[in-house]
Swiss-Prot record:
The keyword Hydrolase does not apply. It comes from the Eukaryota. Residues 53-95 form a coiled coil. Positive regulator of amino acid starvation-induced autophagy. PANTHER family: GEO08385P1, SHORT COILED COIL PROTEIN. Belongs to the SCOC family. Residues 17-58 are annotated as: Disordered. This is Short coiled-coil protein homolog.
Length: 122
């Protein structure tokens, strides 16, 4: 019984292969087109029409996303401005502290260049 089923399946496959050999290919110029268009030029495929509600929902979603991104950009811009101001303030304070340290070092005897002292004779 199993052998008969396999034989039937094999014979069906060879028949299908033989039938597909008879179909004209696009590149075959010798055979004419077997598709009857009724004298009309077929139109290219068009996308399926979408529901108006789907379009409105998509538009509303995109608008809310754009507004959210604009708000985020606004927040980031304000943050950049405040960080710039903080940076300028810290840079100015660093300059003041640097000058203060230089003044302290100049007035302290510890940081003065060592002067060679001649031995005192009595």
């Amino acid at each position: 019984m199993v052998e008969i089923n396999c034989f039937r399946l094999m014979s069906t496959d060879t028949t299908v292969t033989n039938e597909t050999d008879n179909f004209p290919l696009v590149d075959d110029e010798s055979q004419g087109s077997s598709i009857d268009t009724g004298g009309r030029i077929p139109r290219p495929a068009q996308p399926l029409p979408r529901d108006e509600s789907d379009d409105q929902e998509e538009k509303a979603r995109l608008i809310s996303q754009v507004l959210e991104l604009q708000n985020t950009l606004d927040d980031l811009s304000q943050r950049v401005d405040s960080v710039k101001e903080e940076s300028l303030k810290l840079r100015s304070e660093n300059q003041v502290l640097g000058q203060y340290i230089q003044n302290l070092m100049a007035s302290s005897a510890v940081f003065q260049p060592a002067q060679s002292k001649a031995p005192q004779t009595k």
